[in-house]
């Protein structure tokens, strides 16, 4: 996938968040699902709705990370009982390790601790993280999508 397409998709994920249409996990998942030709119906975004703000406001795993792992599952996850899950697990770990290296933590409350919750600075931090993770997930997909 070319850098122009990645940048456009990042901008779309950030816009969904900035316009308050979706939060981190939902924005990222929606953009990747659409990019892949919607292997699952758009309504499946509901599955990502509990992940924002670190698992339902708990401040734990960042929603951009969990949404990214869900999005990778669209391409690498298994769809039948008993199928091999090794690639999906490896891709999830790869994204997790990259995220930790990139941001210093996978914990939402650590990533936003410098900002007042709900402030414009907090929003921009989360939008930036969502965009950056969207880019990484797109780079982890096969070249043909």
Report residues per predicted region.
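Polybasic, low-complexity association/targeting segments
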Residues: 1-19
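Helix-adjacent hinge/juxtasegments
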Residues: 50-83
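Active-site nucleophilic cysteine motif
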Residues: 21-25, 62
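C-terminal binding/interaction regions
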Residues: 87-145
């Amino acid at each position: 996938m070319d850098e122009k397409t990645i940048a456009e998709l990042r901008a779309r994920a950030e816009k969904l968040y900035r316009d308050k249409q979706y939060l981190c996990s939902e924005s990222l998942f929606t953009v990747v699902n659409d990019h892949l030709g919607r292997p699952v119906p758009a309504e499946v975004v509901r599955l990502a709705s509990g992940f924002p703000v670190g698992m339902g406001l708990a401040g734990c795993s960042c929603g951009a990370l969990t949404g990214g792992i869900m999005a990778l599952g669209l391409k690498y996850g298994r769809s039948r009982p008993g199928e091999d899950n090794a690639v999906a697990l490896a891709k999830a770990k790869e994204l997790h390790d990259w995220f930790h290296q990139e941001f210093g933590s996978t914990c939402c409350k650590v990533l936003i601790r410098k900002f007042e919750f709900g402030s414009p600075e907090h929003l921009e931090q989360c939008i930036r993280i969502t965009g950056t993770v969207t880019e990484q997930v797109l780079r982890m997909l096969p070249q043909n999508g």
